[in-house]
Amino acid sequence: MLTFNQNRSHSLEQSLKEGYAQMAELNLSLATEAFPLECEACDCNETYLISNYKSE
């Protein structure tokens, strides 16, 4: 009985780890779609805003 409970516990733990990994991958892919990492216009705009802030 103890072995069964240990196997069941290990199986549940493994399932949770896999589920969390899948959720993390999904969140990352959704974030990448929503906020592209390489956005030259965003970089230029950020530089412009920072330079204006420093000059004031």
UniProtKB/Swiss-Prot annotation:
- Which keywords, in A-to-Z order, does the entry hold? Toxin-antitoxin system
Matches recorded under InterPro entries: Arc_rbn_hlx_hlx, MazE
Q: Does the keyword Zinc apply?
A: no
The GO biological-process annotations, alphabetized, read as: regulation of DNA-templated transcription
What is this protein for, i.e. what is its function?
Antitoxin component of a type II toxin-antitoxin (TA) system. Labile antitoxin that binds to cognate MazF toxin and counteracts its endoribonuclease activity.
**Family according to the record:** Belongs to the MazE/EndoAI family.
Q: How does it assemble?
A: Forms a complex with cognate toxin MazF which inhibits the endoribonuclease activity of MazF.
Q: What is this protein called?
A: Antitoxin MazE
